[in-house]
Amino acid sequence: MFGFFKHKTAAPFTGEQCTVDISENGITINGLKLDVLVHLDAAVKLLGTPRGTKYKTDSDCEEFLEETHGKGAVSNRVNYTWDELGIYCYTMNGKVIHCFGFMFANDPELALKHAPEKMFRGTLTINGEPWQQAIKRGENCDIIRVLPLGVYSVTAEYSDPFGGEDPDDGGYNCVEVQLAE
């Protein structure tokens, strides 16, 4: 954990009890609202202590990320994972969360270091509607489906985009919410 947290705390609820709604107003988890961008401390207070995975950013990647997120925005990339909940997030500076993710299936070919040990087992909705139904109104972008939602963008990554007649046929690996670019 790199010594990020002095005291480890568990989430005050189980993965099955986790209820998440994504809306134009942010993310609501078990009745408590979080914005994206949000300081890590707010997420820790709500979800418990995560596991951290630090990433070295090579110069090409840093240049791309700074073009996207602003000069100096990429200083200490750390992804955090709440293994028991199936939730993860991305930071560019180790403290400000710019993307939340909910993992439904972990593609072994990707071998993501920050993939949760358990998959998300709670309830996920978009504007109160089941996410699988709502995301279909988004744009099909070959390997993901993207749904604009006010200042946010919700993306769902296909498990097997080329395995059926429709990319949605193979299911999804994860759903992420971030500020729209």
Task: List each model region and its residues.
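Short helix/turn-capping signatures at newly exposed starts of structured segments
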Residues: 2-181
